[in-house]
Amino acid sequence: MKMAAVGSAKSTGPGQRSKSRPGALSAPLSLEEARCPVCSEILLEPVTMPCGHSVCLHCFQRTVKLISLCCPLCRLRVSSWARKQSREKSLVNAELWELVRLSHPERCKRRMEQRDGEIPDGEIFRAPVPVHKVGEMRQEYEKQKMKSGRSEETDERKKKMHIKEECVLLKHCQYPFCGVSDSENEEPVGRRTRHVSAFVRKTRCSPAFNKSCLHSSAAQRSRSCTDSEDGRGKSRGHTNQAVPEKANIAHSYNAGILLSSENSRSFSAPLLSLDKRHHWRGIHTSSATLVLQTKPERSISPESNDSISEELNHFKPIVCSPCTPPKRLPDGRLLEPMIVKSTPRNLTRALHKSTSYEASPTILQKWKQIEVDRQCIKVTSKGTVTSPIAEDLNLKLSPVEERDCQPCSCSVAKDRLLDLQCICGSNAHKSKSRKDKPIIYNKRRLIFDPYNKGEEKTQVAALIKTFGDSSTPKACKELCEPSEMGPPMLDSNAGHCNQGTVDPDHNIKINEPTTMSCVLNRPTSRRGKKRSQKTKHMEETLQTKISRTNRYDSLDDLIVQRMSQEKEDRELALKLQRQFDRECKKVDRHKTSRNKYELRSWGSKDGIVGYNTRRSGRVSKQNEHFNYTC
């Protein structure tokens, strides 16, 4: 195409020159001027278009007349000119054609005889053939492979370095004060606190923090150079023990709210160091000790976490995102959120609330077992209990039960049983109405009384009694007599196996023992685990409960086996029933069955039998049959 463009640029000269001087022959044309820009050969019967470009007649017909009617070089449209010249038969530029024949007669003759292949060898360009040496291609391949391998290794090394830098940066962001040494204290503060959160910066800028830093900077700097890690742990422990005793509110209601609010803010609050968070929680959760589990550090700087923790140890509200407001019920009352704590020692408060609603016997039994297990864990745990157990073990009665139950004037002679109440009749009218309608009042109460006789030990007893009709003080005294109480028992609805008692007025048996209630007697949280006791005197306290649990193990296994067998039988019966229903729904299409396909009626609606050549014999027979039956 380049050669065609060059040829065309030079071929415009003769055409334009012939137009300018029509009668005179100019000087001979050079080979480049007489070359066709399309086929790169000598011009044969050239056609000069209005734009001045000249091509061979054969090339003009192939590229212009039959295709686009445009100049192949400048894209000028020559359709009207071509039609006009074709009608006049004057497409060939005669003057230019004569000039080309005079300038290059041999080439024109050879072109007209179609002997274009006899071009001299000097004009043909031959590209040099590259000959490779032995192993040159392999060397180039290995060199390229090594280059790509080096680039991959470099990329992997860069990725590893980037990941390592990100890990170091993340660790520094999480624990900004854990690795600061004395040599780093001389660095600018901005470089060390670059990744500290805005909350810590705000705390540092507070006036109280500045005062504490001024007072404690010299002492902490000297201590960081001289004290050992153990000494620092002890001093930190003494500092933490200096917190006011008002902070010791782990078992109160406000402490639970503080814990729940802190847990809900754990994702929105700024990320402080690990030992600070443990110290803040240790004040609330551990009522026995305030010793911290400190993390070993290389040194403590004046701007370290101790100075910040001195500000945070006081009970001030944490400035962070507000908590979610409590939900409101449709009647307008606020729904108190459920508080979940980490240690079983603090989970006893939920059962101390008065319950005035009706609960199922299974739920009451589970509540009792959970309360007993938690009290055992609380007594036998390693931590010391700040509050007496008697205060924690006394369960309050509901307001409904306090109205119904009136304390009698009977005296308990031998045992020191606290909060023992009985139900006495208020008047004779109520007793008569009760005799008319034999109604059994079954009051379920959970009473945990400390039993101290001769030695310091606490007996956890769940006393739930069922009272019938007792209108006289004598009957009330008999019920309140401690010699007749025996071991603590629950009624049949609460889940224990006990002896049945008979109502003398109505001759109705109350508290019938059930086998199903014995299964629920076992503790839920400590079932199948070895109990670790702190002291030996507690073993005698829980011996009765352990023996009762072992007594019903065999019965428990039997009932579980029976229930599993019933479940398997029920599943088998359902499977057989489904199979039977499937067989009943299946339609039998055999010849002898009643569900077989019905035959088509041979008669039409009008009583005229249709004619069919294929079934003419059968149609006639069927018609005769119908006529005979009718």
Swiss-Prot record:
This is E3 ubiquitin-protein ligase RNF169. The gene is rnf169. The MIU motif (motif interacting with ubiquitin) mediates the interaction with both 'Lys-48'- and 'Lys-63'-linked ubiquitin chains. The UMI motif also mediates interaction with ubiquitin. The specificity for different types of ubiquitin is mediated by juxtaposition of ubiquitin-binding motifs (MIU and UMI motifs) with LR motifs (LRMs). Residues 1-24, 220-247 are annotated as: Disordered. Pathway: Protein modification; protein ubiquitination. Signal peptide: none annotated. One of its GO terms (biological process) is double-strand break repair. A motif (MIU motif) lies at residues 565-582.
